[in-house]
Structure formats: structure tokens, C-alpha cells
Amino acid sequence: NKFEGLEGTYQQSLAASYLLFQKLLKLRNYRGALELDIAEPVLNMNSQGFVQKVTSRRRLVAHQLIEEFMLVANVCAANLLKKNFPQSVFRNHDYPESLKIDRLSQSLKKRGLNWEGTAENINNLPKLLERLKSRPDKSTLHMMVLQSMQRAAYEPECKGHFGLKYDEYTHFTSPIRRYPDLIVHRLLKSIIDKNLNVIENLEEILEHCSTKERDAEFASKQVIQCLICCHCKQFIGQNFKGYISGVKDFGLFVDIPELFTTGMLHVSELPSDRYNFNARSQSLDGRRRGNKFTHGDKIDVYIGEISELEGKISLYY
């Protein structure tokens, strides 16, 4: 009994909730929704306000239960909005672009995974994720899958959510911290009051919300990166295993899972060669000596210079 020791009322409520949660998980699997397991950093601070240790956030059953219940609430709200308004607030997630899927397929092959980016395989991505469960580099591979996806956005027309495999989806559960949720609550209230409230300039408002969401996400990541950079100064000169998470004509972005961070390996630090940037294969190809560095490749790097204020780590090969 998972809830032994609780008072009767709480025990019954939690037992019923857990039973419903299990049924929702089965429906999630039946739909083919994506379940990405990506390590999220938790910064453990000391009394002086500096990062003492970086660990991975634990995802408990309680977190999953609440998440599934919130998804159901969001879907119910979206269904009601679609029935009552020609335009409303929807959280859409488009089908992934073919070029990104092609890159994902190539990156997986380099890690011994034969997966072709066909339409059937894209719709059955959960089967691929299931194959990755027992691999030690699971989190890295899941991040590759995430990077191949489109960004979700707020839009007035309902287009569905690819990742969650819902025909209609919106954000309803957090009106105190997300403006789109507040709009959804106002629209739902107008349905209850039988006085439908049509919002002017809705498309512009939702586009603004999507932009600000990206800005807030970027700012949050930058703050975390700056704090992690301070923590990483103690590792300057040390060697770490990483993987190439981005390729540009000027160098490589390398993720270092052990440190929960990303650094830049400038092209000048690579083995001597004349490198060409191949946008399609996302690689730096050496014309003279045949060196090649491709998105998804494993790579050993040294921590070089660190700029805490800029949140940047320079790497050496």
C-alpha cells in the first residue's frame, strides 16, 4: 500500500488519484506521446551564495501524476474553447522539419542506432525512445531528439500538438504566471456567463506571448549557465567527455553532461586542417587531412578559459 499511514480521507483520495494516473499513462502510451528524459540541473548553493554542487533533478511519481492531471485539464479547456470560438488560445506543436529529422537520423547512426527518418518512424518516435532506455547516454540521445523538434507556440487556430499527440491543446493551469492561461480563463468565464468575449488583436497578442516565453527561457538558461561557469572554474585544465551539440563555421558547441554545461571549441583548436562547414550534414569537414566533426559525435575536451559574466566556456581539444 503506497499510502499506508495516511488518514482515511487522504488515503482514499490519493489511491483513487493514483489509479486514474495509471490509466492516463496507458492512454499516453496508446496515443504515442513523446516521453523525453533529459537531465535538468539543480544548483546546490552554499551559505555564501555560490554553487557548491550541480546535481540532476529527480522526477518523482508525484510529479508525473500532477503533470498528467494538468494535461487533462488543458485538453478539456481546449476542447471547450474550440467548440465556442472561431479563434482562441491554442498551444500548437508542429510536425518536425524533414532536414532536422535527417540530421537526427545521421547522428543516431554514428552511435550505432539504425533509424530512418520516414513518416512512419517519426510518428512512432516513442519506439525509438524505448530502445534508448537502457543506454548510458540516454539523456544525451533524448536531447538530440528534442533538438530535432519544432518549438511549441501560442496561436489562435487549433493545429494540434505533435509531442503530446493531442488534436487540441492549450495552457489553462497557470494563470498566475502565464498570460495565455489568463486569457483562457477569461474566455472560459465568458462561456459560463453565456456572454462570449471576443478578444481583439488575438494573433498579435499570442505572437507576443510566444516571443516573451522564448526570451524568459533564454534569460533563465543564461543565469543558470553563469552560475555553472563560476562552479566550473575549479575544473580548468581538466579533461571531460562530451558530445557535439552544435556545428558552426567557426567551431563546435560541445555538451559536457557531467558538468551540465556547454562550451565552445573554436575551429582553430581543432587538428590542423582546412575545414569546410557542411550545413546539411551539420559537420566541419577537413579538406586536406580528412578530419571530420559531426553533430552528435563523442569528443574529449579540456576546460580552457571561462567568462562567468558572459556564461561562456572555451574548450581545448
Each PLM stretch: what is its role?
Residues 1-277, 296-316:
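Electropositive polyanion-binding surfaces
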Residues 272-291:
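Surface-exposed acidic, glycine/proline-enriched linker/cap segments
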